[in-house]
Amino acid sequence: LCVNRLWTNTLPGRGNTWAKAMKLVSTVKLQKARTRAESAKPYFQKMYDTVQSILSKSGNIEHPYLTFNGSEKKAVIVVTSNRGLAGGYNNNIVKLVADSGLPKESVEIYGIGKKGIESFERRGYYIASDDSDIINEPLFSDAVEIGRKVLDAYAAGEIGEIYLAYTGFKNTVVHTPEFIKLLPVEVKAEEESEKKSQAPMNYEPEAEESLDLLIPKYINSIIYGAFIEAVASENGARMQ
């Protein structure tokens, strides 16, 4: 009976059928993730552009989210996957962070995805947080929770900078590793040029305080956008 079962499992074509089934599942997941990423991207881009525009016209606002708080520690939110067999998807993100120029001893990894966390542990990085289950089915509330963790650490002076590393989704075959700085918020070069050519806007104290609400929403939106782009990119990588 065991011999017959072994023979049956190795029949020509059986493996091909399984491979085709798995590819079909991956195709469906990719289509769903791609639709989600493409439909959400304009919103997150608008949020980013809005914050950049406000800051470029604001003059010199003194706010904790815009200035260095004295801590040399760097929080890096790293988005990878929980599974391998995705080409260079996971390794590219790990390498991007390792080659970023941030001193290893100053970096605290907020890991989303077991593969990335395992790689950073082998390299001797400090893992501040492991929220790997999030990437299976990421929700906006998950992004809010990660945002809360890093913002609380920033407000307490435990970290001085916040970065985000993930794989950006361009299309089904083009996925680009991204490494961006979230805090302190920096004005893009082109926005900075525009800022110098315009008279600064006058802000009342209440308006400056509104950054307490705006910046966390901005951070949460960028993190969630990274989650859904990463999921689409991962599924795309598995199809190649």
Task: Give residue ranges: language-model regions.
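C-terminal beta-strand-loop-alpha-helix "lid" module of Rossmann-like NAD(P)-dependent dehydrogenases
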Residues: 1-240
